[in-house]
Amino acid sequence: MLLRSRFLKVIHVRKQLSACSRFAIQTQTRCKSTDASEDEVKHFQELAPTWWDTDGSQRILHKMNLTRLDFVQRTVRNQVKIQNPEIFVPGFNYKEFLPEYVCDNIQREMQESIETNLDKRPEVSVLDVGCGGGILSESLARLKWVKNVQGIDLTRDCIMVAKEHAKKDPMLEGKINYECKALEDVTGQFDIITCMEMLEHVDMPSEILRHCWSRLNPEKGILFLSTINRDLISWFTTIFMGENVLKIVPKGTHHLSKYINSKEILAWFNDNYSGQFRLLDLKGTMYLPYQGWVEHDCSDVGNYFMAIQRLN
């Protein structure tokens, strides 16, 4: 499989020469194993000025952000246990047997209890890898249960745009920090790490995953991934239609050879961290012109979201 060959290439490179040396052969300016190519950085540098234009180059990303945020919030809420003894949680599919108004009351009380418990929990720290102009970073920083967000990206112009845009919202003061740096230069550990629409733009995705995992809180930290399966449907929707026909995605944004199947990521975790992780959720997602981004259960086709929890 392609992803495994890219992973194995990292191992082979380490045996023959360091990752820095390998990049130094190609260019004298990039020598981090989690770096993107010069072409990738240049491409996103050109997109930086229109990053926050909802009708501009990133309009599809703006629409997708709502679905990404829903996926993150739902996953986190699902980890909150209902501790109020006054709330009865049936041990069966109550929606099939109880009246609708009873089901609605049960659901409402459960949600209220979850929100209350979530607000009482210690606030979480977030690392947004490949934050670009800060679309997801800002949304995460506005959540009440998030203490702070650190956004990193290799494109300096995107970081400048992110910093300037964050100044427009007083709520974000002290809650968000942006830096132009490689992932392996980040210190500390985080409760949540997001790596969304990023893996398909790097040469060594295994290095990104490895460094993300090492910076994830061992006490049940969660890694959120969002990328694209490598298949004909993905090429047709994202490259042929998205970039060339509809032109709703800037041309040159995607490369089929860099797409990663969801099964390949799970296989990599099983090979490297067997028994040390738990798959919390895996959903496919697709863009419908008159509806926006929606989730579905075919996670091995097109775009997908993945949430992986670290276990002790």
From Swiss-Prot:
Localization terms from the record: Mitochondrion inner membrane
GO cellular component: extrinsic component of mitochondrial inner membrane; mitochondrial inner membrane; mitochondrion
Pfam families linked to this entry: Methyltransf_23
Alphabetical keyword list: Magnesium, Membrane, Metal-binding, Methyltransferase, Mitochondrion, Mitochondrion inner membrane, S-adenosyl-L-methionine, Transferase, Transit peptide, Ubiquinone biosynthesis
Top EC category: transferase
InterPro entries recorded: SAM-dependent_MTases_sf, UbiG_MeTrfase
Ligand binding (S-adenosyl-L-methionine): 68, 130, 153, 196
TM helices/strands, residue ranges: none
An example Gene Ontology biological process: methylation
Family membership noted in the UniProt record: Belongs to the class I-like SAM-binding methyltransferase superfamily. UbiG/COQ3 family.
Stated name of the protein: Ubiquinone biosynthesis O-methyltransferase, mitochondrial
Native source species: Saccharomyces cerevisiae (strain ATCC 204508 / S288c) (Baker's yeast)
